[in-house]
Amino acid sequence: MTSGSGPRSDAMHREKNFPVASWIIHPRHRALILAFYRFVRMADDIADHATLAPDEKLLYLDLLEAELLGKGETRAEAVHLRTALDRRGMPPRHALDLLTAFRMDVTKQRYENWDEVIDYCRYSAMPVGRFVLDVHGESAATWPASDVLCAGLQVCNHLQDCGKDFLNLNRVYIPRDALSASGASIEELGAAKSSLQMLQCLRSLAAKAEVLLNGGGALVSQVKDFRLRFEVSVILSFADKIVSMLKMRDPLRERVHLSPLELLLHGVGAMANEAARRAFGRGTRFKTTVDV
């Protein structure tokens, strides 16, 4: 497989609820973060590919890992990330953890309970936050708050895309026991709108995601880099709005995402709030970290 061939899908263009190298991030960090992002998107393309067999997907993911570790030069995404990490003297541990999650996407299509979902988040979401913190030289003491924030964002994404994931990928992140407790079934995820039972299930999970996001609020005060602190504040503002929408709307019936105007308004509001906190010692988003 050459650098110009191999699996490609529309995953590069899909909205995800985790940090990318926005204009807020200092320019000196953007190249590495973007290299990481492109590597992750390539792995996502593979795991979500519509026509590749599971064994083929795993082989491609193994190739990405091998080349990230220096064994080959055919995948530009792996080579560029490896080079960028080497330049900064950073190990590939977080990218390797994410590859574990993509392998889970290939081999595990159902989750029995909340604990299994959180275990998936340990590989699919938490490494993203840890990577960004490491790039900025932040202490590992910030990881617990980052972990719950990233897990909350991941659960929100699962709820936003639950119908599409089921119909397009036969992949269900909604735990079986939550469906059962509400009297809903997996097959209902293919419907044009949610039953009352499905809405009860999805909203109960949105409430759990909200608890995680509240725990992640502690990250704002823990981060030392002021640009990254603004970035976290903006992400939290977006997440608060999304989770409130998930508690009121039906993701099977309508697209539960922020509009460009909402993104702008919430971003400006979050930055203004953080600026006020820095100037006057006030803030509204300081919560205790929760265990996951």
From Swiss-Prot:
One of its GO terms (molecular function) is lyase activity. GO terms for biological process: terpenoid biosynthetic process. Its EC number is 4.2.3.156. Pathway: Secondary metabolite biosynthesis; hopanoid biosynthesis. It is an enzyme of class 4 (lyase). SUPFAM superfamilies: Terpenoid synthases (SSF48576). It holds the Pfam family SQS_PSY. CDD domains: Trans_IPPS_HH (cd00683). Keywords: Lyase, Plasmid. It catalyses: presqualene diphosphate + H2O = hydroxysqualene + diphosphate. Involved in the biosynthesis of the hopanoid precursor squalene (SQ) from farnesyl diphosphate (FPP). Catalyzes the second step, the conversion of presqualene diphosphate (PSPP) to hydroxysqualene (HSQ). Belongs to the phytoene/squalene synthase family. HpnC subfamily. This is Hydroxysqualene synthase. It comes from Sinorhizobium fredii (strain NBRC 101917 / NGR234). The lineage of its organism: Bacteria, Pseudomonadati, Pseudomonadota, Alphaproteobacteria, Hyphomicrobiales.
